[in-house]
């Protein structure tokens, strides 16, 4: 047995007698462990009490457990890790997925429009993405079929439509020429296409509404009817205004300006390019009140903000008239800028009536 083993097998008195100095380690270890035991004892005391209470409650039955109520717990210096692992204190209630933020009633109308509450949505059948794509394909097919049928019907009466659209300037002595072979044929195709699209637009609008309306809330469905009706009326009103006021004024300006200098012999294709673009651009520009009403309902712009920028609106109306009209004369631009400004002010008034 080695020296280490010999030391372990001898008593302290024997080792001391042999001249080996031995230090009493056990009392020293006890003294060193006294502070550690004294610190750990308070931490273990609540746990012992809790176990004793649980044992008493188990013996007395469920009634004693209910009567005892919550068990008292004392905090201890060594319970920091356990406290960190416990559940956090309850925070403010979460409403409508806002994570403690403002409720849905306090949020903007745009947020409500993008993320409506389930209570506002009607109880319609849910569809997958493939069902939506299939429905979209069917509605596009119906729209194309309706527009194609309208174009064929207009092509059957294309000559009558050409004579009807030539009426604003025929009284001024203007004659139309066919400058290339087939020019009149392609002109009739163009006129038939524009008129067929105009006649088929109600069906296109209906298919769009039928596709979109299942995803709208009840309030949005009530609001959709006036928007669609107002948009359709304003579009056809713009076309009527262009045919009766804007186009004759612009064409008469050109005829009178060239009177005495040149004879007015116009290309049939260039004339219908001018008249058709002017009519449809005027119809689209008459949608300004509809856009204002939509922005007001979404809460993006108020009526006071619309009226406060009237100076910029005047400049914008003139610029828009210059872009929308195919001619460069100032008379046509002013004739279109005036109604645009009036429509803008009317739209701001409508937004104010609705409480925005």
UniProtKB/Swiss-Prot annotation:
Name of the protein in its database record: Sec-independent protein translocase protein TATC, chloroplastic
Gene encoding the protein: TATC
Biological role: Part of the twin-arginine translocation (Tat) system that transports large folded proteins containing a characteristic twin-arginine motif in their signal peptide across the thylakoid membrane. Involved in delta pH-dependent protein transport required for chloroplast development, especially thylakoid membrane formation. TATC and TATB mediate precursor recognition, whereas TATA facilitates translocation.
Segment annotated as transit peptide: 1-55
Natural source organism: Zea mays
Keywords: Chloroplast, Membrane, Plastid, Protein transport, Thylakoid, Transit peptide, Translocation, Transmembrane, Transmembrane helix, Transport
Keyword Transport attached: yes
Source taxon at top rank: Eukaryota
GO cellular component: chloroplast thylakoid membrane; TAT protein transport complex
Pfam families: TatC
């Amino acid at each position: 047995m080695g020296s280490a083993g010999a030391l372990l097998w001898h008593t302290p008195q024997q080792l001391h007698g042999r001249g080996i100095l031995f230090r009493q380690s056990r009392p020293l270890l006890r003294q060193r462990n006294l502070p550690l035991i004294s610190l750990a004892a308070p931490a273990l005391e609540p746990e012992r009490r809790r176990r004793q209470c649980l044992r008493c409650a188990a013996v007395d039955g469920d009634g004693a457990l209910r009567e005892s109520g919550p068990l008292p717990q004392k905090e201890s210096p060594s319970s920091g890790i356990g406290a960190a692992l416990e559940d956090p204190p309850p925070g403010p209630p979460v409403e409508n997925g806002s994570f403690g933020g403002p409720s849905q009633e306090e949020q903007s109308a745009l947020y409500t429009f993008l993320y409506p509450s389930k209570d506002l949505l009607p109880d319609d059948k849910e569809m997958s993405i493939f069902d939506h794509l299939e429905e979209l394909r069917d509605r596009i097919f119906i729209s194309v079929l309706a527009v194609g049928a309208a174009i064929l019907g207009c092509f059957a009466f294309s000559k009558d439509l050409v004579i009807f659209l030539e009426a604003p300037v025929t009284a001024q002595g203007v004659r139309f020429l066919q400058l290339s072979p087939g020019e009149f044929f392609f002109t009739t195709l163009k006129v038939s296409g524009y008129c067929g699209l105009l006649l088929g637009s109600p069906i296109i609008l209906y298919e769009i509404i039928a596709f979109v309306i299942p995803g709208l809330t009840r309030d949005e469905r009530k609001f959709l009817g006036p928007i669609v009706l107002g948009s359709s009326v304003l579009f056809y009103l713009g076309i009527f205004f262009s045919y009766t006021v804007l186009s004759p004024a612009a064409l008469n300006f050109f005829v009178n300006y060239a009177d005495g200098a040149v004879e007015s012999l116009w290309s049939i294709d260039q004339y219908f390019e001018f008249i058709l673009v002017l009519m449809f651009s005027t119809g689209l520009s008459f949608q300004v009140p509809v856009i204002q009403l939509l922005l007001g309902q979404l809460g993006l712009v108020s009526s006071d903000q619309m009226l406060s920028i009237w100076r910029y609106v005047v400049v914008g109306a003139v610029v828009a008239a210059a872009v929308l009209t195919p001619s460069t004369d100032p008379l046509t631009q002013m004739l279109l800028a005036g109604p645009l400004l009036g429509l803008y002010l009317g739209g701001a008034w409508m937004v104010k009536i609705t409480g925005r």
